[in-house]
């Protein structure tokens, strides 16, 4: 399965080829008709048409739609000049577009399930009410010693692989049936490491929970995502909004544990998990810092022909309908300013254009500098790397957490 999904990987093997061929054939014919290049029948009136949606592509008027996106609520563009007021209004605007109400359901945790020992830390499962809709089972790692400890909310990627979620980042110690898949994922993206285990070994409490559709809460299939998203919209809810609310709830649960120093809680994620990390930092006061690996771009720059995000499906986990009429991706992340935030990007990452990364970084830099907190924003690009989170990068992130928490 080649790399290329905005959350980690592209369509499952074979899907892209068949859809792409159909899209080419249909799209080519439609393009000829819509641009007036097709030869009309004898005696027929020639009509130039526009406003098409060729199969598998952007609408032909997408440049006009992009021109209409001015992101008027962005800091520096918005008429609001007081940053605290702007942050409050911007956060409220994001929350309005989640289509999922805030949740104050009691967590009612059950600790101590499936305990095990790691290298300097203890593993256990914890079951708690993530939302009013149900309880989930999380992986909770606690360093040996006396707390309270700093903590990391670890947010998994997408990758078009649904049999594992939290196990992509925390070694499955009680379910051997998931170990082979988890190890293969770690080998592919994380230099063979389990990021959560490494964080716990370095002294951090770690919580990882399956997003809706993965692991214990799935598995869904790639093809079912679009229907799942549509059904939630029809029920007045949102797939992306649900994930955002759940991540905020998970942050609150982690920060409230007795073993955790609630002033030193960070969010960390790779790919879709990176999107989740900066989004959670923007929406939750329980997150003091965030590290985002391989997901930051300007919206206009990622919405280009051939980009993976155009396929739909996985994109629904990161799509808040209508929000783009107010804020760009880096504008949402900027709601977290002036918290310490680290963004890592691979220069060879096929999912994000260099221009998109540049635009996003410039916006982020301007916001943190406006708060006289430029030193709290760390933007790093590794020209030789693609869509990966390597062992040296992991060490960089943990060292950075050590310095800011």
Task: Give the ranges of each region predicted by the language model.
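N-terminal secretory signal peptides
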Residues: 1-19, 32
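N-terminal export leaders
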Residues: 19-28
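N-terminal cap/lid segment of alpha/beta-hydrolase-fold proteins
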Residues: 102-145
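Short beta-strand element of the alpha/beta-hydrolase
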Residues: 148-157
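Cap/lid segment of the alpha/beta-hydrolase catalytic domain
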Residues: 156-245, 302-304
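Gly/Ser-rich "nucleophile elbow"/oxyanion-hole loop immediately N-terminal to the catalytic nucleophile
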Residues: 226-270
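Mobile cap/lid helix-loop segments that gate and shape the active-site cleft of serine hydrolases
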Residues: 233-234, 289-333, 353, 357-361, ...
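C-terminal catalytic histidine-bearing segment of alpha/beta-hydrolase fold enzymes
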Residues: 367-405
């Amino acid at each position: 399965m080649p790399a290329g999904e905005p959350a980690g990987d592209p369509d499952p093997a074979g899907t892209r080829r068949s859809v792409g061929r159909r899209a080419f054939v249909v799209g080519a014919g439609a393009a000829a008709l819509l641009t007036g290049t097709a030869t009309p029948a004898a005696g027929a009136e020639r009509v130039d048409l526009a406003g098409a949606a060729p199969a598998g592509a952007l609408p032909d008027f997408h440049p006009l739609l992009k021109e209409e996106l001015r992101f008027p609520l962005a800091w520096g563009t918005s008429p609001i000049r007081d940053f605290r007021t702007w942050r409050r209004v911007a956060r409220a605007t994001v929350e309005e577009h989640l289509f999922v109400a805030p949740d104050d359901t009691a967590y009612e945790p059950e600790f101590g399930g499936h305990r095990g020992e790691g290298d300097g830390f203890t593993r256990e499962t914890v079951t708690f009410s993530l939302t009013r809709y149900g309880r989930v089972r999380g992986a909770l790692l606690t360093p040996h010693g006396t707390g309270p400890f700093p903590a990391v909310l670890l947010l998994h990627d997408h990758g078009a692989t649904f049999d594992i979620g939290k196990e992509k980042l925390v070694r499955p110690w009680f379910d051997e049936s998931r170990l082979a898949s988890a190890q293969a994922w770690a080998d592919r993206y994380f230099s063979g490491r389990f990021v959560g285990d490494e964080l716990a070994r370095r002294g951090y409490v770690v919580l990882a929970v399956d997003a809706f559709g993965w692991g214990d809460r799935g598995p869904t299939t790639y093809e079912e995502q679009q229907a799942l998203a549509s059904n939630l919209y029809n029920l007045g809810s949102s797939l992306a909004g649900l994930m955002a609310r759940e991540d905020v709830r998970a942050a609150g649960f982690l920060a409230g544990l007795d073993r955790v120093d609630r002033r030193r809680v960070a969010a960390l994620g790779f790919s879709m998990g990176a999107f989740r990390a900066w989004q959670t930092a923007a929406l939750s006061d329980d997150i003091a810092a965030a590290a985002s690996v391989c997901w930051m771009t300007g919206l206009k720059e990622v919405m280009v022909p051939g980009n993976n995000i155009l396929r739909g499906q996985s994109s629904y986990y990161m799509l808040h309908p209508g929000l783009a009429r107010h804020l760009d991706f880096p504008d949402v992340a900027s709601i977290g300013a002036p918290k310490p935030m680290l963004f890592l990007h691979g220069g060879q990452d096929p999912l994000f254009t260099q221009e998109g990364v540049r635009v996003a970084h410039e916006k982020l830099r301007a916001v943190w500098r406006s708060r006289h907190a430029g030193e709290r924003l760390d933007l790093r690009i590794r020209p030789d790397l693609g869509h990966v989170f390597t062992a040296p990068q992991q060490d960089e992130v943990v060292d950075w957490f050590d310095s800011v928490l």
